[in-house]
Amino acid sequence: MDSLMLAYLFPISVASIIAFVFLYNLFSSRTLKNKKIRTAPMATGAWPVLGHLHLFGSGELPHKMLAAMADKYGSAFRMKFGKHTTLVVSDTRIVKECFTTNDTLFSNRPSTKAFQLMTYDNESVAFTPYGSYWREIRKISTLKLLSNHRLQAIKDVRASEVNVCFKTLYDQCKNPSGSAPILIDMKKWFEEVSNNVVMRVIVGRQNFGSKIVQGEEEAIHYKKVMDELLRLASLSMFSDFAPLLGFVDIFQGNLSAMKRNAKKVDAILENWLEEHRKKKNSVAESQQDFMDVMLSIVEESKLSGHDADAVIKATCLAMIMGGTDTTAVSLTWIISLLMNNRHALKKAREELDALVGKDRQVEDSDLKNLVYMNAIVKETMRMYPLGTLLERETKEDCEIDGFHVKGGTRLLVNVWKLQRDPNVWVDPTEFRPERFLTENADIDVGGQHFELLPFGAGRRVCPGVXFALQFMHLVLARLIHGYDLNTLNEENVDLTESPEGHVNHKASPLDLILTPRLHYKLYE
């Protein structure tokens, strides 16, 4: 009887246990899921397929629109850019979490169709995925071009090019007739001096300036091709966000234009590479430019699976693009702000006169002692960062500010809002360089202080910070020390930002009247 009962009850007991375990796991997993998965709020107004992309067609500056959305949704919220989910953040604490605790996860920079087509796809150090290849190229770039030792070695080259451009500037602003004042297009001049220095350091060439006669046709062609490259690179492509709409890019002709430009860029770089290869064994080490260095070491590097010539061309192109437009834009903003804050300009000139006097030009060795000048540069980069939005992509699931973030999610840091946070900065909309001499004196722009990130942060921070700062300080000091600057009728400068491009350009020209204030022999 007991055996029969046991035989009867056993299957029921087993079935009951299985059912209980199943139901327990079902409900507990749902409970745990609901408890664990907490995502950042999603902004309303997304369209099918396009997501929130339609919001960026209003003409409003993206960083200002996203800043207003952050005021509504919080310092971390999500948006849909076509097929891509994007986490938008604008808080110092959250940004620090992204680039310290989760820095490895956010070490990839999303690429675009434009950069894939025109900058050698994944060979470029700017967009190649984080890994052994990126680390090797980054090391080469940092040690062979951007290290303190290398910057010291190329100091004379930089100074030589700056001298040439300032001689050109002096010739331009002479007014022997004494008639109507001569207006100098400072945006154009800043572009010339930036390009000359960068081109000389990277590939040993000088490509801009009114005094160039030899190779002028080549210089004009190069500038035309590079201007087109930068214009096309700034375009938003439907295929980057919604592949189903990729036919629109073809219809608009953007893809074919990019492919044509890529061939022109490659032809220029290939020509330079062949010239460097021919003179490889005849250039003294002290006279080598960056392309020379790349040629001498790329074969010994751990770059298996990558075409050596493509690596050299891609790396040099990335350095040129990263060092020309950006420094010129920063210098334009600095002078624009000083023209609207003449007291700061006066204070900067007094610092220069006290340190340098009026019997010689500013030299590299003076720069470290120009404390107020350094504060001016920091304050300008705080108010008008080169990149108002910093983009990354996480490789796998992680947690940010208590929110679950799925692998593949893109990160968009609103640097502009971050650097105008009233909880961090006193009077954030006011141009006040003195803040970096007092309450914010310990903050620098190298990416270690997350309140101020004009050059980015984490593993992908701009490697050329020291190069850019040394160059900008030298040009700025020479300009303010050597010239009285004024606008026509002493009007204020328009500080409107341009909505176009990846770099935060000033929308209108910067035309100034320059009057030499030192002995004429110092300009020769």
From Swiss-Prot:
Its EC number is 1.14.14.98. Pfam families: p450. One of its GO terms (cellular component) is endoplasmic reticulum membrane. It is a multi-pass membrane protein. Pathway: Alkaloid biosynthesis. Keywords: Endoplasmic reticulum, Heme, Iron, Membrane, Metal-binding, Monooxygenase, Oxidoreductase, Transmembrane, Transmembrane helix. It is found in: Endoplasmic reticulum membrane. Catalyzes the conversion of protopine and allocryptopine to dihydrosanguinarine and dihydrochelerythrine, respectively, in the biosynthesis of isoquinoline alkaloid sanguinarine. This is Protopine 6-monooxygenase. The gene is CYP82N2v2.
